[in-house]
Amino acid sequence: MRSRKSSRAEAPGLPTDRQLGLSWDVPGLLAGVDEAGRGPLAGPVVAAAVILDDVQPIRGLGDSKVLSERVRERLFDEIRAKALCCCIAEASVEEIDTLNILQATLLAMRRAVAGLRLRPNKVLVDGNRLPVLQVPAEAIVKGDAKVAAISAASILAKVHRDRLCLALHEAHPQYGFAGHKGYPTPDHLAALRVHGACGAHRRSFAPVREVLLERRP
């Protein structure tokens, strides 16, 4: 087995695993976890888990929300090719409406970690809430801008969900999902009032619920 050295996968400005008190010199692996799609009115919430390979650096990692779509798409392919392992998971619209968005997000995170081919000995999660996991975990606020593995997870989750929204647009072009990605923009809210909700809309979210009530006979 090849020896592990301190991680070189972080982009300039991101702290190394050793600076975070984590080291490849001890047995085990570090996974980063992040989500995409908590705020939209439609579609699943997506989570990703990534274990990076310190001998295959990925340059340019950062918060997916501040990267251009072109850069995210390029990094998506590079992360999938170079990571030791990764997993993208979802919680459905039905699960969101049944559990609430927070619990559905934590469920998607659990599924992403459980789907990793390798078992991490620690999981770092973006934000301030942790899913229940079988391994030690730590929540890191703004972790997608601080930790390379979380940044990689945020990119995988964001790109995957954006692609789902393109598919939703093909099925329901009247809502404009390709543009707003399900977020409550004025155009999306106007389309909801005109066309009502489709099967991809989250009925538990107030703007959708209000439209459904308005359209009751």
From Swiss-Prot:
Cofactor list: Mn(2+); Mg(2+)
Record localization: Cytoplasm
Keywords annotated in UniProt: Cytoplasm, Endonuclease, Hydrolase, Manganese, Metal-binding, Nuclease
Keyword Hydrolase: yes
Catalysed conversion reaction: Endonucleolytic cleavage to 5'-phosphomonoester
Single GO molecular function: RNA-DNA hybrid ribonuclease activity
Domain of life: Bacteria
Cited InterPro entries: RNase_HII, RNase_HII/HIII, RNase_HII/HIII_dom, RNaseH-like_sf, RNaseH_sf
Domain RNase H type-2: 28-217
Protein EC: 3.1.26.4
Binding site for a divalent metal cation: D34, E35, D126
A UniProt-annotated Pfam family: RNase_HII
Gene Ontology terms describing biological process: DNA replication, removal of RNA primer; mismatch repair
GO cellular component: cytoplasm; ribonuclease H2 complex
Cofactor binding note of this UniProt entry: Manganese or magnesium. Binds 1 divalent metal ion per monomer in the absence of substrate. May bind a second metal ion after substrate binding.
UniProt entry tagged with the keyword Manganese: yes
Similarity remark: Belongs to the RNase HII family.
Job description of the protein: Endonuclease that specifically degrades the RNA of RNA-DNA hybrids.
Annotated protein name in UniProt: Ribonuclease HII 2
Species this chain originates from: Methylibium petroleiphilum (strain ATCC BAA-1232 / LMG 22953 / PM1)
Designated gene of the protein: rnhB2
